[in-house]
Amino acid sequence: MKTFAQKLEKYAELAVKVGANVQKGQEVLIKAPIDAGELVRIVTEKAYEAGAKRVFFNWTDDKLDHLRLKHASETVISEYPVWKANKLEDLVKRGAACIDIRTTGIGMMDGIDPKKAALDQETMWRALNTYYDYRMSDRVSWTILIFPTVEWAKKLFPGKIRELAVADLWEVIFKMTRVDCDDPVQAWEDHKKTLANKVSFLNKKKYKRLHY
């Protein structure tokens, strides 16, 4: 049976080899919450082992974002930092692979004016339009990893102490991502082949509509 450390390493390896498909000489951008430092370091190591030229980091913190939205004026919130947008846009234009490590953000918007929250999202999407366009059109490779938090784990496993709840949530994530397989990377390659075969089969049938 794999240890937690071994599973975490396989999780990081999947992100690099399958999710982002990092190539030799490619730059990599990792966006992650500060609580995920251990995972970020492992992903970074795997990226360099895969031949990454450089790895850049974009750190986030829900509590700091909460404070910003709570205290900043709408005028300030409507002004996205130009340097930050330029940095992200420059990286994707250079073909950087993007690896996002995300949490659920439970409670982040508690007590925040909905108008401010909506304005913040609108401002970000407008400023990062080119960056997101590169990703959504698959002009760069990108992937998303999930990182469990205590708040999320306690929501799912309310009867357990925080440490056990987080451990159980990790196991759910490892199972969903095939990390619990003997060879997770090969398991995903096999899964991709299965999907491709099914797509080919359905396309050859030339179905016009489905009734169910």
How should these model regions be labeled?
Residues 1-212:
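Active-site bordering "gate/hinge" segments
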